[in-house]
């Protein structure tokens, strides 16, 4: 499959996502790419207000990555097929054994600068507001000792809210913040995750 190779698992999807953004008249402004170190693997943690978040990150994050996403994404037309072809990791939240296996597969992907993208809220918001970040979403970062990169996406909820069947034209912004290492002490981790959430929220325009 496309996902069997770092290069071909990423670039076709990137081109596809950028073309979709151009065709659908949704220009994307990106800030903060200079915060990333070449060759370093990261765990990107983004807010999730719309299915369109997938197009924005896929097309404009500028890094080869695997996606950790919920099983339901498979069923979304075009999006699900492309993500499966790229070898992304689907999590079945209703089947813990399968979910743990998927997480192990995700960890194997984090080599040679390949990163992982997560939506710590676990699902799309129905209001446009950023929900609580779930601690389990950061498990890969703690086990692999990888830095978390908060990502703020703006405009996607207006372009494609849950109430609309299709997206509409609109301007989008993605801010890539400076990497953060999670604290080794679990007692401080909850506070740090909330700090990451606040960084994401403050970056939304």
Which role fits each region the language model picked out?
Residues 1, 7, 11, 34-37, ...:
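Membrane-interfacial terminal anchoring regions of lipid-handling membrane enzymes
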Residues 1-14, 22-24, 37-96:
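Catalytic core of membrane glycerolipid acyltransferases/transacylases, capturing the structured
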Residues 18, 55, 138-139:
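Active-site phosphate/pyrophosphate- and oxyanion-stabilizing loops and adjacent acidic/basic residues
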Residues 20-21, 83, 109, 141:
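A generic structural signal for well-ordered alpha-helical segments
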Residues 29-31, 89:
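General small-molecule cofactor/ligand-binding pocket signal
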Residues 30, 44, 67-68, 174-176:
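Generic preference for hydrophobic
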Residues 34, 96, 154:
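Residue-level "edge-of-site" marker
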Residues 100-205:
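Non-catalytic C-terminal accessory region of glycerolipid acyltransferases
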């Amino acid at each position: 499959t496309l996902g069997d190779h770092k290069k071909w698992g990423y670039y076709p999807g990137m081109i596809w996502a950028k073309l979709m953004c151009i065709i659908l008249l949704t220009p994307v402004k990106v800030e903060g790419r200079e915060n990333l170190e070449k060759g370093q693997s990261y765990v990107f943690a983004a807010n999730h207000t719309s299915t369109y978040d997938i197009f924005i990150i896929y097309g404009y994050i500028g890094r080869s990555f695997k996606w950790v996403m919920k099983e339901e994404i498979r069923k979304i037309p075009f999006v699900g097929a492309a993500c499966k072809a790229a070898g992304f990791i689907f999590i079945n939240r209703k089947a813990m054994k399968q979910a743990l296996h998927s997480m192990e597969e995700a960890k194997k992907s984090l080599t040679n600068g390949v990163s992982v993208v997560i939506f710590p809220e676990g699902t799309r918001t129905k209001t446009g507001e950023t929900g609580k970040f779930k601690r389990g979403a950061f498990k890969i970062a703690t086990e692999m000792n990888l830095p978390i990169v908060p990502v703020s996406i703006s405009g996607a909820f207006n372009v494609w809210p849950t109430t609309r069947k299709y997206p509409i034209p609109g301007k989008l912004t993605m801010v890539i913040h400076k990497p953060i290492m999670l604290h080794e002490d679990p007692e401080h981790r909850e506070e740090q995750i909330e700090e990451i959430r606040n960084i994401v929220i403050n970056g939304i325009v």
